[in-house]
Swiss-Prot record:
Protein name: Obg-like ATPase 1
Residues involved in GTP binding: 129, 263-265
Presence of the UniProt keyword Transmembrane in the record: no
Source species: Arabidopsis thaliana (Mouse-ear cress)
Annotated residues for binding of Mg(2+): 38, 58
GO cellular component labels: cytosol; nucleus; plasmodesma
Gene: YchF1
Length: 394
């Protein structure tokens, strides 16, 4: 008997992502005191929060939502001229500076670490500039040492957390024969050994079942990281800095996460200028703001994407977790949409832009109906059909 043909739409199976499965995810700005965290936050959000030259001046995490710059959204708004325009946003938390020994409560360590546990990703800000007027908690500027300090503190806190979980599970096993406890214990022991070997959880080759358990722990070293390298304006302009090669080498050796050089001084100066003046200044100095890239990279790092709904009343970005299926995406609009999901009518932004309008997309056969198993892609334009008891279709 010949083998059964594979289903045509069976694509590669993606393994689950580390982290919470939610559309309400946030990223935290983390680093040592006086590296430029609050300056970055102030510039991103244009909020007036303290950024004085004093360790621990940020005690409670400040929160803000920053719009995601997107030419696709701008084009849709220009095309549909809607009454309402709602872009995607990145929720950013400014978290006070960590110091060596934070996992043992040094400085304000326990508070800060709990704030980091509450976010879904990390903007790790590194100071790569020297300035006698801005103190460094370790006196000498050394970004690689700072990298090791922060990553070690997060890892040590994870080791402490996992150790306590192992104790709890072992106690539970004395009272229960639940097989799941044994599975959890074996994973915890494996994770503890991994951490004690100096490796972050996010770089482990975990099985699907492992990831489902790990996601209940919210481990600090499991969170995605984007390294933001704070330079002085001169180094940023000439794209050279004596610390950058060493930072790059360290990052490549430790997982190869994204690095983005920026200049807090330059960004703050731009933010204080009128738009025309800022554009002229950038053109004259052959510079551009790093903020759009920082925002987009942070949004992607925490595994968020968005789809569009578009019409004359409203153009809106709907944020969902990467790997979300059509019914889950529908639920981002309203729970009834998910509960009574019938299908998703989908067109790609690129097709709409190329062909000019919805009827042309349909005529070209590029307007598709997708069912419950469809995995929504970033930039999809979707119209959902649903039916619930006592309701109608949309």
């Amino acid at each position: 008997m010949p083998p059964k043909a594979k289903a045509k739409d069976a694509g590669p199976v993606e393994r689950p992502i580390l982290g919470r499965f939610s559309s309400h995810l946030k990223i935290g700005i983390v680093g040592l005191p006086n590296v430029g965290k609050s300056t970055l936050f102030n510039t991103l959000t244009k909020l007036s929060i303290p950024a004085e030259n004093f360790p621990f001046c940020t005690i409670e995490p400040n929160e803000a939502r920053v719009n995601i710059p997107d030419e696709r959204f701008d084009w849709l708004c220009q095309t549909y001229k809607p009454k309402s325009e709602i872009p995607a946003f990145l929720e950013i938390h400014d978290i006070a500076g960590l110091v060596r020994g934070a996992h043992e409560g040094q400085g304000l360590g326990n508070n800060f670490l709990s704030h980091i546990r509450a976010v879904d990703g990390i903007f790790h800000v590194l100071r790569a500039f020297e300035d006698a007027d801005i103190i460094h908690v370790d006196d000498i500027v050394d970004p690689v040492r700072d990298l090791e300090t922060i990553t070690e503190e997060l890892r040590l806190k994870d080791i402490e957390f996992v150790g306590k979980k192992i104790d709890d599970v072992e106690k539970s096993m004395k009272r229960s024969n639940d097989k799941q406890l044994k599975i959890e214990l074996e994973l915890l022991q494996k994770v503890k050994a991994w951490l004690e070997d100096g490796k972050d959880v996010r770089f482990g080759d975990w099985k699907t079942a492992d990831i489902e358990i790990l996601n209940t722990f919210q481990l600090l070293s499991a969170k995605p990281v984007v390294y933001l390298i704070n330079l002085n304006e001169r180094d940023y302009q000439r794209k050279k800095n004596k610390f950058l090669p060493k930072i790059h080498a360290w990052v490549q050796e430790h997982g190869g996460d994204t690095m983005i050089p920026f200049s807090g001084v330059f960004e703050r100066s731009l933010a204080d200028m009128a738009p025309d003046e800022a554009a002229k200044y950038c053109e004259e100095n052959k510079l551009q703001s790093a903020l759009p890239r920082i925002i987009k990279t942070g949004f992607s790092a925490i595994n968020l994407i968005y789809f569009f709904t578009a019409g004359p009343d409203e153009v809106k970005c709907w944020q969902i977790r990467r790997q979300s299926k059509a019914p889950q995406a529908a639920g981002a609009i309203h729970t009834d949409f998910e509960r009574g999901f019938i299908c998703a009518e989908v067109m790609k932004f690129e097709d709409l832009k190329e062909l000019g309008n919805e009827p042309a997309v349909k005529a070209a056969g590029k307007y598709r109906q997708e069912g419950k198993t469809y995995v929504v892609q970033d930039g999809d334009i979707i119209f959902f059909k649903f039916n619930v008891s006592g309701g109608g279709k949309k």
